[in-house]
Regions:
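Active-site metal-binding motif and surrounding structural segment of the metallo-beta-lactamase
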Residues: 69, 74, 98-100, 110-157
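Conserved beta-strand hairpin/beta-sheet module of binuclear metal-dependent hydrolase folds
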Residues: 71-124, 246-259
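Metallo-beta-lactamase
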Residues: 76, 100-101, 108-110, 164-235, 281-293, ...
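Sec-dependent N-terminal signal peptides
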Residues: 33-41
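Accessory terminal helices/loops
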Residues: 50-64, 173-177, 186-194, 199, ...
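Feature captures hydrophobic
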Residues: 412-427, 431-443, 448-608
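C-terminal motif of bacterial Sec signal peptides marking the signal peptidase cleavage site
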Residues: 44-45
Length: 608
């Protein structure tokens, strides 16, 4: 005997759903249709976040209101102290001394830094005696070449800045470049860009030129200096980066705070990717500001702030917001919360939400909570199902199977698009495309969901990420930062950094049967290295091993420029000399190293 059952149930948005369960046999019940019923309930009422309808212009007010913060202008904070805002995503700051100048932060590229220097020269023609980096982010250091053309100023920074720059610019450059291009909207039309949350724009493109002058003087905890009669105290203040510093001008009671505070909820985590940013260190560093009680606060993004009590109140709210996220995240973590549930638990108090300096136009509380979990406990959520989780393709196949096939899930996804549940559409379209990349009918649904989410989003980073991914999917490309390093910039990077980056591109499948040692003699730097290629691993040894199978003599700059494609490999290789082995053997060695091609986020790697 069997049974036909028709069920009516009410979902969200007051829609009534009707499902007819087919013939149920005692020996072989149609489990899939029952699971489909449960699946629809789960996706409709429990596990998805309902998307808002697309915003009209008035709903962009939170992001657009901040445009005035980034107006291109040089502010006179006090006599002899100037902050240049709006020349790029970050500020550059000028201090005028008795017989020279101090520059704090140098913008993100040479064209912008040359322009700000020209305008600084309208204020003073004195020589630049010192440059101070507040931290290692590109928008604060890669314009430095403009400030050292005719002089050799001292360059001050925290002792950890240089190794951080070298690591960031070698190990994860490709993926952080891609995610940065999405986050900052480098591929978007100007009409799609309001601002980037902490500045007017970040405009890296193929014509962008960078240069970085390494520090000449570093310190660990604090350092008192005097430059051209200006007494300054440099203070280590880890926050947005571990190498962050403050610069205190005691005579004028001015504090330059880098990126530890700006007019937005802080980027306690950045979606372009970063190492863990300690929330505790961050709010403790904000307490340094409160203890110093400056009359003027000069951030490296946005306008200067004046008024001792006003600054104290702003910073108190700011540090309280960071500590609140830190403490309440730990409270939930210790209670056993899953990261997804922790995000729902930790919500800023209303009085902090009202602060004009805590609007979520750059950082977000939810991202910060997830980072707090990962930074304190690592990747494992505590759910045993995630010890050996289904891979993304298998999980997508399971979801499609539960839905009764891709046609059913596609139909359901379309229904969600009609009622403007864009986050649901984004999630389900990902399952469908991972299940079968040939389901081209899904792509327009996903693109529309991404675009609607982007239009309605007031967080600049999320907005640009949504819109750029829609563009990538529409035009089938992967966003990348197109900037190539200049020969001058490459010259400043040690050979060991370049080699470390090079060996990370080893294709193990081409080297599992290999055991060879290749020696490098860099004639210009008088350095020697050996790369021991051993069954899928390339070990860099900082010396020339006697039993090397192949030994090549070369110029380090040729090697760097060849690897970054500033020079043609075909012509550059002809300049190398071989003390042992030959060009053919060396070419075969090089072929074993190649970076994996980047894929669109929603795709599943083939692992070929």
């Amino acid at each position: 005997m069997g049974l036909n059952v028709k069920v009516l149930f009410f979902g969200s948005q007051n829609y009534v759903y009707s499902l007819t369960f087919g013939w149920f046999d005692k020996n072989c019940m149609k489990i899939k249709t029952l699971v489909l019923f449960l699946f629809l309930i789960l996706f409709n009422d429990c596990n998805t976040t309902k998307s808002k309808t697309p915003a009209n212009d008035s709903e962009h007010i939170h992001l657009e209101e901040f445009n005035a913060e980034f107006e291109k202008k040089i502010y006179e904070v006090a006599p002899g102290v100037y902050s240049a805002v709006g020349y790029g995503i970050a500020n550059s700051i000028l201090l005028v001394g008795k017989d020279g100048l101090v520059i704090i932060d140098t913008l993100d590229e040479l064209k912008a830094s040359k322009q700000v220097l020209e305008d600084f020269r309208k204020i003073s023609s004195l020589p630049i005696k010192a440059i101070i980096y507040t931290h290692s982010h590109p928008d604060h250091i890669f314009g430095s070449g403009s400030f050292v053309t005719d002089v050799s100023p001292e360059v001050y920074a925290h002792e950890s800045l240089l190794p951080t720059v070298q690591k960031l610019a070698s190990e994860t450059t490709p993926i952080i470049g891609t995610r940065s291009a999405r986050m900052f909207g480098n591929y978007l039309e100007k009409s799609d860009l309001v601002n980037v949350g902490i500045g007017p724009y970040q405009g890296y493109n193929a014509d962008t030129k960078l240069d970085f002058v390494p520090p000449t003087k570093t310190f660990r905890d604090s350092l008192n200096i005097e430059v051209s009669g200006i007494r300054l105290r440099l203070i280590h203040a880890p926050g947005e980066t571990d190498d962050q510093i403050y610069i205190y001008h005691p005579e004028k009671n001015i504090l330059f705070v880098g990126d530890n505070i700006y007019k937005a909820f802080p980027n306690l985590y950045t979606i372009r990717g970063t190492w863990f940013r300690s929330l505790k260190h961050w709010y403790e560093s904000l307490d340094i500001i409160r203890n110093l009680k400056p009359e003027h606060l000069v951030p490296s993004h946005g306008k200067p702030i004046s008024g001792k009590s006003y600054i104290y109140d702003i910073v108190t709210d700011y540090r309280d917001a960071v500590q609140f996220v830190h403490d309440q995240s730990l409270r939930g973590i210790n209670a056993g919360y899953h990261p997804d549930d922790l995000v729902q638990l930790v919500q800023l108090p209303e009085h902090l939400k009202k602060s004009p300096y805590l609007k979520e136009i750059y950082g977000k509380v939810s991202w910060s909570v997830r980072s707090a979990f990962a930074g304190n406990l690592g990747w494992f959520s505590g759910d045993a199902a995630e010890l050996h989780p289904l891979d993304r393709k298998v999980y997508a196949d399971l979801i499609v199977d539960l839905a009764g096939g891709s046609e059913n899930l596609l139909k359901y996804t379309k229904s969600k698009l009609q009622i403007k549940e864009y986050q649901t559409v984004l999630t389900l379209s990902g399952y469908l495309l991972r299940h079968d990349p040939k389901l081209t009918d899904v792509i327009p649904l996903r693109i529309e969901a991404l675009e609607k989410l982007g239009v309605s989003e007031s967080n600049a980073n999320a907005k640009h990420y949504y819109l750029t991914e829609a563009l990538e999917l529409r035009n089938q490309f992967v966003a990348k930062i197109k900037v190539r390093p200049s020969p001058e910039l490459l010259r400043r990077y040690p050979v060991k950094v370049i080699l470390s980056s090079f060996v990370a591109n080893l294709d193990p499948k081409l080297s599992f049967d290999t055991d060879e040692k290749v020696g490098f003699i860099f004639l210009d730097t008088k350095e020697t290295y050996t790369i021991h290629l051993r069954k899928g691993v390339a070990e860099v040894i900082p010396s020339l091993i006697a039993d090397a199978d192949l030994i090549v003599e070369l110029n380090s700059q040729d090697w760097k420029e060849m690897l970054t494609r500033l020079k043609s490999p075909a012509t550059t290789l002809l300049k190398f000399r071989f003390k042992k082995g030959n060009l053919l053997s060396f070419t075969q060695f090089l072929k074993k190293f190649s970076p994996k091609e980047q894929i669109l986020t929603l795709k599943v790697p083939t692992n070929q």
